[in-house]
Amino acid sequence: MDVSYLLDSLNDKQREAVAAPRSNMLVLAGAGSGKTRVLVHRIAWLLSVENNSPYSIMAVTFTNKAAAEMRHRIGQLMGTSQGGMWVGTFHGLAHRLLRAHHMDANLPQDFQILDSEDQMRLLKRLIKAMNLDEKQWPPRQAMWYINSQKDEGLRPHHIQSYGNPVEQTWQKVYQAYQEACDRAGLVDFAELLLRAHELWLNKPHILQHYRERFTNILVDEFQDTNNIQYAWVRLLAGDTGKVMIVGDDDQSIYGWRGAQVENIQRFLNDFPGAQTIRLEQNYRSTSNILSAANALIENNNGRLGKKLWTDGVDGEPISLYCAFNELDEARFVVNRIKTWQDNGGALAQCAILYRSNAQSRVLEEALLQASMPYRIYGGMRFFERQEIKDALSYLRLIANRNDDAAFERVVNTPTRGIGDRTLDVVRQTSRDRQLTLWQVCRELLQEKALAGRAASALQRFMELIDALAQETADMPLHVQTDRVIKDSGLRTMYEQEKGEKGQTRIENLEELVTATRQFSYNDEDEDLMPLQAFLSHAALEAGEGQADTWQDAVQLMTLHSAKGLEFPQVFIVGMEEGMFPSQMSLDEGGRLEEERRLAYVGVTRAMQKLTLTYAETRRLYGKEVYHRPSRFIGELPEECVEEVRLRATVSRPVSHQRMGTPLAENDTGYKLGQRVRHAKFGEGTIVNLEGSGEHSRLQVAFQGQGIKWLVAAYAKLETV
């Protein structure tokens, strides 16, 4: 039988994995090493060479997109669709199983799946029905608690509270939630896996049926599995099934949502004699980029070990840029992208990666100023985010009480006991009397036309808005914004959200304060009050909208969102201690290695050119912060890195330190630290100098106006 079509396009290690005898196998697949190709060709090998039936194969992926691509590529390779295989995500396959055996799983035939929004709404109702204070027992935290317990395979009666009243209350919420779901025939995502696992445990004959059927199990991205997913695979395989897992311990970056990189080692322990094959040849990046990635990840302990290599070109060195601040950093990145575009490169080939969503705002503004289209991958633009729109709505209502859209958004955010029934009365009266919602509320309260509790809550809300408007009127814009975020209860509400999502929302609110501090008037805004001018600016930015999907646009995304993607030109910004690695990882033991794996993922996204940037000073989350360069920069081989400009000592062993100083004076006669006066912006201090002659530029920090770049020849600055 001619099997050359299955092997000819593969390298030696890929061939070894594809053509191995049927056995348990770990394929350690480095970034860009062709793991999807290996999985597809392995399935084709099992079908055509080993003569296994499609019905014997289950392939598990982590996204529906990956599953669809795998099915498509298998069909292309085999020349026909292979019916009978189960190819899908853990959740998709568990759902299929429960549909087939709904009675044995104690589910109605027409059971419905709850998405996270539905889950939140149900929990909100239950917490209220249990007479619990929603501020103390937030629905989002309840959802996190329940999903975490299910991911560990735990039902309410399994949980040991040890007399802890907080744990006991969450246990009761979980119990009430589960009973409500069972009554209504509802199943959330975590329940799909747990219920399917319990089905096999409670009905051995069903488990045996699937063990006899699925004798070949293949699992992709194994480093991202959690405990219940591992238990699911282990139970199905039994003693006779053959399991091939594909994963990369160096790319395990989802520990915060329950992923267990240790599952790879558990597999080796539970399947003694399993073969390990390392895919180390990289088809994506240049040799310089791979050398940097290898050196970086070698600083982690307990790795299973592999070293990426390529037979491609050495490529350009990694560029390292030290910016004065985040504005300079954004300007530098945009200028580099402009140069790439001018040389014939597409904008879509450029990706800007950052650790935190809050970092995108300054980058977005720089791209907008350069009229450069961009797209936020897997996320929303800064001014479109929920928490930002909440805060802006408070500011809008303070600026204009008759803003009905802003009123609707914040009247019960955070919850104040102003229910839909009360608001329906307000809306109807507004229509009848042809008045705004605010005006109607005033009249209804004066007429005592609303129920007591709701009336009191509405009265307090209106007093809050009036007080904020009066007390903050003369404050600087950033102080006013910070006060509104705190006094409105928004900050407290989002602080109660568990996990990374809540932390991200707080960071974004603090970044909004920074945005108001850095905001500077355009000429057309000069007749407006600062708050009105900023709100106009925010509305216009949000109104720009995402670049159309067909449009050539720069890609912006978090490092987590970048996993699995590749780009010719990659920028990783904010490479500073406390930013990346994040402060949380420095404060919590065991998190630093996951941050380093995240850096490794970022570096290995780059195909041709990688640029790393850090700032000496950064106004982030509402305050000026001075950070040291990230330790990850110091872990890169010196010969792989070329510094565009260096302003601080890089954090690396003393023998490798490279030091530099900023340009202190240029041929215009201006000096760093010199006090100057501008006709429009007032007094400020020169914080950066660049270029010479007619191209000389100055960066000046103006009091109350932010930091601005000026062309020295046209600035007409006076020395103070």
Swiss-Prot record:
The UvrD-like helicase C-terminal domain covers 287-564
Q: Name one GO molecular function term.
A: 3'-5' DNA helicase activity
Q: Organism's domain of life?
A: Bacteria
GO cellular-component term (any): cytosol
Assigned keywords, A-Z: ATP-binding, DNA damage, DNA repair, DNA replication, DNA-binding, Helicase, Hydrolase, Isomerase, Nucleotide-binding, SOS response
Q: Does the keyword Protein biosynthesis apply?
A: no
Q: UvrD-like helicase ATP-binding domain spans which residues?
A: 8-286
Sites binding ATP sit at: 32-37, 284
Q: Which reaction does it catalyse?
A: Couples ATP hydrolysis with the unwinding of duplex DNA by translocating in the 3'-5' direction; ATP + H2O = ADP + phosphate + H(+)
- On whether Cell wall biogenesis/degradation is a keyword of this UniProt record, the answer is no
Cite a single Pfam family from the UniProt record: UvrD_C
What's the Enzyme Commission number for this chain? 5.6.2.4
What GO biological process term is on the record, naming one?
Answer: SOS response
PANTHER family found in the cross-reference section: ATP-DEPENDENT DNA HELICASE SRS2 (PTHR11070:SF2), UVRD / RECB / PCRA DNA HELICASE FAMILY MEMBER (PTHR11070)
**NCBIfam families found in the cross-reference section:** PRK11773.1, uvrD
Q: What does this protein do?
A: Has both ATPase and helicase activities. Unwinds DNA duplexes with 3' to 5' polarity with respect to the bound strand and initiates unwinding most effectively when a single-stranded region is present. Involved in the post-incision events of nucleotide excision repair and methyl-directed mismatch repair.
In which family does this protein belong, per the annotation? Answer: Belongs to the helicase family. UvrD subfamily.
What is the protein name stated in its UniProt record?
DNA helicase II
